[in-house]
Structure formats: C-alpha cells, structure tokens
Amino acid sequence: MKFTNQQIDAINHFKGPALILAVPGSGKTTVLLHRILNLIKNHNIDTSEIISITFSKSQGIDMERRFLVQNPEFKGKITFKTIHAFCYEIVRNYMKLKNIKKTLIEGNNEFNRILILKRSYYQKYYKKLSDDEINDFFSIYDFTKNKMFDFEEYLKKNHFISNRTLMLKLYVLYDEIKFNNNFMDFNDLLILANEYISTDKKLLRALKNRYKFFQIDEGQDTSTLQFEIIRKIVFPENNVFIVADDDQSIYSFRGASPENLLNFKSIYPDSKIFFMDKNFRSTKNIISVSNKIIQGNKIRYEKFSKYTTEESSQIMLFKVKNSMIQSREIIKKICEINPNETIGILYRNNISSLYVAEVFKNNNIDFFIKENKFDFYSNRILNDIKNIILFSEDTSDLDVFKRIYFKLNAYIKKDFISKLEYKSYNQCVFESLLDLDELNDFYINKFTSLRNDFKRLKRMKMEDKIDYILYEIGYGDYLDNFNDFSNLNYNLIFDLIKYLSKNIKTFDEFIEKLEILKEILKKASNSKSNISISTIHSSKGLEYDNVFIIDLVDGEFPQKSVLNSFDEKLLEEERRLFYVAMTRAKKRLFLFTIKERNNLPVDPSIFYNELKNKNTTLPWCFASGGYPGTLLFHNKNTTLPWCFSSGEYQVTLLFHNKNPTLPWCFASGGYPGTLLFHNKNTTLPWCFASGGYPGTLLFHNKNTTLPWCFSSGKYQVILLFHNKNKKGAKLLLFVFCSINTSNNTKNSYICNWNRP
C-alpha cells in the first residue's frame, strides 16, 4: 500500500505525545493500524503493551478484523477497547481485590437504569415519567458527569433547561437508588476508575507498567473525564497517540469538546501535531463546498481538506413544498442512481426516519437502518393527542381527563378536579363541572365551549383532528408555554402525525400504522440493502456514493434550542454536524429543505442558504449568539451598490451617502435613505462594514421580533428592526440594542425618522 508523506510521518512516530489531525476520508484508521505494526516490528514493542481506545465496540471489532486480515499471526494479542470497557476492567479488578460489590445497570435490556428509575419514581410519587422527561434527565446527567460538573450547579446556571425542579428530583432519586442498591452505570465506571487511580498508587503503577503505548481513535469524541483518566496513566512518558478531527466533534451532549484538542499543546508541551489533509473519499467540489461550510466556525484548528481527484460531481439543492413532496423527490432521484451504488439518507432528528420509512414502504424499497431510538408512539406529544382523542370518544372518563385538563388552556383548578370524584359514573365531565356551585361567567363559558369542542372533535376525520386539537382546544397554547427551550419544534411532530394520517379514519388505525412502521424499522436493521437511512450522528465514520441530507429546516437543523440559547459553541457544533453529513458523500450530494411544516411556512436552514448562495461576492455572515446569516453582496447593476436579502424579505439597499454628515444609509421598502452612523460620543459602534470599516457582521435574526441584526467589536449583538406593526405608529421606528459582553450591560436606543 502506498502512503502519503503525511501518513508516513504519523505511522513512524515512536515516543511522546502526538495529535494527528485527520480530515474526512484521509485514511486515519489505516494509519492507526499500521502504526501498531510499526511499533511491534520496528521498535520491538510487545503487543501486550499497546492499547487502542475506540469510540464504539463495533468500531473496535472492525479495526481488529482489518488488522488481523493483514497480520493473522497476532490473533488474540492486540487490544482494542472502548474507554468504558477499559475502565470496567480497572474497576472490576480493583473491586475484586478490595471485596467491593456493585452491579452494572447498563448494557442489560432487562435490568437497566431507565426502567429502574421509572419504576422507582412511580412507586415514590405515583406518577409516570414520560420518555422525553427521562431522556432529558439522563442527557443532562451524563453530560455533567463526563464534563466533571456539579449537577445542581449546572441546573442553576443554565436557565434554558425546562422543568429544572423535576430534573433535580430525579437526580436525588437516581443517586439514592444507586447508593442503596450498590448499582453503578457507565458514568460511574469512568468516575470510579479516575478515583481509584488517583488514590491507589499501586494500581496506577500497575497500569503504567502494563500499557506503555496508548492510541486513541476519534479523539474529538473523548470527554473531559476520559482525557483525564488517560492523562494520569500515560504520565510521565506521555506515549499517547491521538487521531482526531476537531471539525467532527459532535458529541458535546456526552461531554466531548474540541477544546480538548485545541488545548493539546498546553497539556503536552512537547507534543507533535501532524496534519493529514488529503481527502481520498470525496470529489473536488464536495470537498471545496464542505471546506467553505466548516470555515464558518471559529473554535477550530485552521486547516483545509485537499482533493486527490479532479473528478467533478453533483451537488443538488431542492426546495419543495412539504415533506410529502420531499419524499417523492427522494424516490425519483434514487430511481435515477445506479442500483450498485450506495445511498445514505441522513437527518438531524430521529423523527425524520418515519417520513422516509413510510414512503419506502409504499414504494416497496428495501433499506437498512443502523438504529432507531425514536419511539414515536411513546412520545409525550403523541400521548397527549391520544388522550385528548380518547376523551372525545368518552367525555365521562375522569381518569383520562385528569391527564389532559391542565393542557387545555382552561385554567381548571385542582379543587374542581377533586369535586369531580363524586360525579355520576356516566356523566360528562363538563356537565359535572357546570353543575359546580359559584362558577363565574369565565368558567361557565369555558366549560360550555370545551364541551362543544370535544363533541365536534369526535365527529372529525383523523387528519382534521390534529389542527383542531392544536388551535381550537388550546393544546397549542400549552405547548408554546412549555416548549420554549425544547430541542424539537412540535410542529414537526404534528406534521408527521398528519402525514401518517392520510386516508385514516380512526386513531386506532393510526396506532396500528405506527406498529407496522415500527416492525419495518426493526427488520431494516438486519437488511443487506445498499440504501441506508440514518441520523447524522450514527453515520459518522461511514461513506456513501450518494448522500441525501433531508429536512434542512430552520429550528430543526440547527435545532430550536440552539438558536434560542445564544450560545456560539452550540451553533458551531451544529455546523460541525452538517459538515460530517456532507463529507459522507463520495460522488453526489443532494440537499433538501421544505417550505411548509404542519401547513405553516418555515425557513430553510442557514446551512442550506449558505450553500445556495456560495457564489456571491461576500459570504453569509452570522454573529456569535446563534443567529442565522443574511446575505451581503455587491449589487453591480444599481447606483446603490451594497445589498442584502434574507428569506421572504425584499432586497434592502445599503449605500454610502457622501454629502450628509451621517454617511451610512440603507433603503428599505418605501423608506429610502434611513441613516445609520457611528456617533463617537455613544457606545454604538459602526453599524455596517463597508469601505474602510471591515469586520462588522450583518445577519437576519429570524427567531425574535427584532429581525435585522448586526454585531461589531465587543458588542456581540446589535439589534435593529423596523416596527411596522406598532399600533397607531406614523413614524418609522428603529430600535438599537447593544450588548457589551465585557460587562454584560445592555443599552437601548430609539430613533425616529418622519418620512413623507
């Protein structure tokens, strides 16, 4: 096998810390495996002294298989382990020595931490936990453990976390369960391993003597705690060889961070950093476009993927009306592709898999899915829909009503519910409520209205029920209040329910359809089809001749919670995730966005827009804080040269007015010549970058009522908007809000121009 000079340098590295920054398709696994062989054959290192830490068990099995195909004489002598398997070995041996007994409650389908916590919570509080609630808890719990954060402090500092009271209650209960029953989970394997090697010098010395050379694959996905464990074991020889790509760090929810790689030199001052920047996988234009995408991030090593072939390929962008048409277009394109080529259909959210599975089922297309963790029919929103529909079928069912009454925007008091315990068995709940003494007019009207709403709901077709529940019964208002910081836009779930409800009359038929889809997805995990559907996270490390990235919708990718968090690091991770998706493609790349979700207009993802406008003079800009970009470009055909546009907004012209003392102007709609300027006596910086004033970022903030935004210098977010809807307003009103990040102060300015 012929290696590049970069690969040879990495393979020949012997002792001391080394970081190999490898772009997608650069042959990093090949390099890691050949370095093992080089250590054994050229440096006489015993096989038992080398350990390779892999990201997943399946990855380790595959790497061992590849190594033994070329070197069968080393069967049973080479060690590939996940970090959890490595730590389990440490913890198990230490506990055996010290006669400590603990039971691992992960990796066992019959006896796992989710079931244990669900049962314990119900036994203690007589309430059932939803899948969303328990998944939210373990996401936060796992993250804090791997980042070595205090759980309670993290909850206090992060106000974006919904239902913090419940999260804290679950934290206390879960730790209590583990303590009382001598349980441990995967997090505890890491925590205990770190504790044992920190306090037991004999144990640490034994590990140092046994493993002299550490290799870590997918180093960008290693958490802070995992890095710390390895750092202690390799010290002071520091024979650690890490293969990574900071641009593919997509597991922050597991405690991973690109900063672990960016700080490598400070942790290991005498380390060597190797760059493997030749991409042998993708065509020239796929590499070029993906390079431009990832350069939008700031927290990264500066590097570029280099192509190794001049072969051109297709990058096609589709903007279609809705998910149904998106599915049809995917089928159409698949039929045009050589049946011997591989196809990967990638998505940000697991819920998208059901759109694809449904259309493939209807077209008799076989497909493979690695895993599908989204259990749709146990989803909180679907359960609510189910209960609301069940109650419409029998409005005397008090048990069902108790599960939904506080979600109907009716302000029903708990006292009212208590009094309903004495109602007649067959009496309508609303009739019983109307019989209560001393109801004011509000409640009389509300209960009468709800009684009539549920009568109408019962008579509707399944497809029509969804909008009625959302907009008429009041469930949409409940979700708006509850879902402010949720990862998933609930319109995506409602859209899917309606999508799957086509030609279905009853809710029972709908549930039956979900069961069929569930069985199809289960069988697909054993399929040998060359068509795969996968989350982007699960596709990492894989490659396909053709890649479809679907559902590129603002608020879904990047996720709503990321855009609402104003956290630049989270937005950068979403960009890395998109970069990972793009770089799975070898020959062709198809990107899809839609115009409507749940019959409501939606905007394309900022990443889709960046690709769509990649040939403009100036690229899409976006400021820290997670705001989407607004295209800024030079309009050569008018006397007003600087223009920007975003979404359905018309082109706005920006120009330099040389005559007035207020030189910077832009024209919007029928209001030409609005003046923007730098007043040295205020804290407002320059508003637009043009001519001699570089570095100001202009962008469109779609997620707030202040749509036109730009940032400059230390003022991270400057908000500008035209309040056209202000009641009784005759003046053109612009508002500026500057946020000084050095002291977190905010200043607001209101300017009025009276235009004829």
Residue ranges and their predicted role:
Residues 81-89, 215-218, 243, 408, ...:
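Conserved helicase core region in the C-terminal RecA-like lobe
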Residues 402-424:
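Helix-hairpin-helix
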Residues 17, 23-26, 37-192, 209, ...:
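A basic/glycine-biased coupling hinge at the interface between accessory DNA-binding modules
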Residues 434-538, 542-543, 559:
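Accessory C-terminal helicase-associated subdomains
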Residues 1-62, 224-241, 246-395, 531, ...:
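Conserved motor-region signature of P-loop NTPase helicases/translocases
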Residues 199-212, 235:
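Short basic/glycine-enriched coil/helix segment immediately N-terminal to the Walker B
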